[in-house]
Every structure is written in structure tokens, then in C-alpha cells.
């Protein structure tokens, strides 16, 4: 019997693409790179912040006939992205229609609800508190403890901490 449900955040619970795109574009343009489009941002997200920035810089460099991404460029874009995304993560994000009602219904049916995201953990928690306060049993984002999906550390952690029956945990390494 299913007792717990794990959700992604971006593109599943919330529409956050505009805030992500605007933040990355401010970092890119400030460092002499070209902007990415919404469609490109959608294509580049999903594997964590490092991949998003690396793909965005490489795309800009392809236009200038080189796709080499230097660590110094990555660090400069990252610094601006992190600052801007703190401003945009709430103001430029929308909860998908009926999501809160659906989650509340699942909660009332006895499911444990979790978020496991490749977004930085420092962004996940404020977003969950703002959009879905009190709904999720735990929300985790990218961190040294969890890593990024498809790494199974996040699922292992949630299973070991929140599923009380030891027999349900046997297959987890």
C-alpha cells in the first residue's frame, strides 16, 4: 500500500520558469553573455543549478563559435543568479491551479507528502513555506547530503527518516 508521495517542485507544483529565466539572464547579461529564451530555460532546467548555468553559458558561447565554459564565468553568473533568485523565487512563481486543494485532499487521505527538488535547498524551503505551508512532511533540495536527482540519496533519506516500518525499508541501501 502506498503511504507516501514525493513531488518535484518546479513544473510539478509550481510554475517557476520566469523567475529562473530572469535570474539566469541577469547573470548572463551582466557578464557579457546573451540571454536565453523561455523555451531554452525549460530545456536547460531539471538537473540542478550547476547544469543550468553551464548549459546557458555554453549556449551563449556557441553563438560566438566556442562552447567552453570557464569556472570563473560560472562563478560570476552563479553569484548574480543566487542574488536575483532570492528576489524572484516567490514574486515570479505561481502555484499551479488547484494544487493546494489536491495536496490537502491527499493529506486528509493519510498520505505522507514530500518534495524532492534539484533546486537548491535554500530556495526550496522558503518556497514551500510560502506556497504550501504545513502541507508537506518534509521538503528537500540540492545539498551535499541529498545531491541532485537521479541520485537516490534523497529518496533514501526520506524513506529512512519517515517510513516507520523497518520491513518497508529493507531494499534501501
How does the language model describe each region?
Residues 46-85, 105:
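A metal-dependent, Asp-based hydrolase signature
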Residues 7-9, 81, 155, 162:
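Conserved hydrophobic/aromatic "anchor" residues
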Residues 83-115, 121-126, 152, 156:
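Short, acidic loop-to-helix structural element flanking the phosphoryl-transfer center
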Residues 19, 48-51, 122-123:
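Short alpha-helical
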Residues 1-43, 54:
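Active-site neighborhood of HAD-like aspartate-dependent phosphohydrolases
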Residues 91-94, 120-164:
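Substrate-recognition "cap/lid" segment bordering the active-site pocket of phosphatases
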Residues 161-173:
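Single conserved hydrophobic/aromatic residue that forms the stacking wall/gate
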Residues 29-35, 61-70, 108-109, 132-135:
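Short helix-capping segments at alpha-helix termini
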Amino acid at each position: 500500500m502506498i503511504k507516501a508521495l514525493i513531488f518535484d517542485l518546479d513544473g510539478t507544483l509550481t510554475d517557476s520558469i520566469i523567475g529562473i529565466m530572469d535570474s539566469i539572464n541577469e547573470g548572463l547579461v551582466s557578464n557579457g553573455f546573451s540571454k536565453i529564451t523561455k523555451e531554452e530555460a525549460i530545456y536547460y532546467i531539471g538537473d540542478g543549478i550547476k547544469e543550468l548555468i553551464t548549459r546557458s553559458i555554453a549556449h551563449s558561447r556557441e553563438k560566438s563559435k566556442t562552447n567552453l565554459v570557464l569556472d570563473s564565468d560560472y562563478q560570476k553568473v552563479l553569484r548574480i543568479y543566487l542574488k536575483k533568485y532570492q528576489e524572484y523565487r516567490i514574486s515570479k512563481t505561481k502555484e499551479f491551479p488547484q494544487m493546494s486543494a489536491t495536496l490537502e485532499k491527499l493529506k486528509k487521505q493519510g498520505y505522507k507528502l514530500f518534495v524532492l527538488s534539484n533546486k537548491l535547498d535554500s530556495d526550496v524551503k522558503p518556497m514551500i513555506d510560502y506556497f504550501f505551508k504545513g502541507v508537506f512532511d518534509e521538503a528537500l533540495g540540492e545539498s551535499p547530503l541529498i545531491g541532485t536527482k537521479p541520485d537516490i540519496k534523497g529518496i533514501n533519506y526520506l524513506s529512512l527518516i519517515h517510513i516507520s516500518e523497518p520491513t518497508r525499508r529493507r531494499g534501501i541501501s
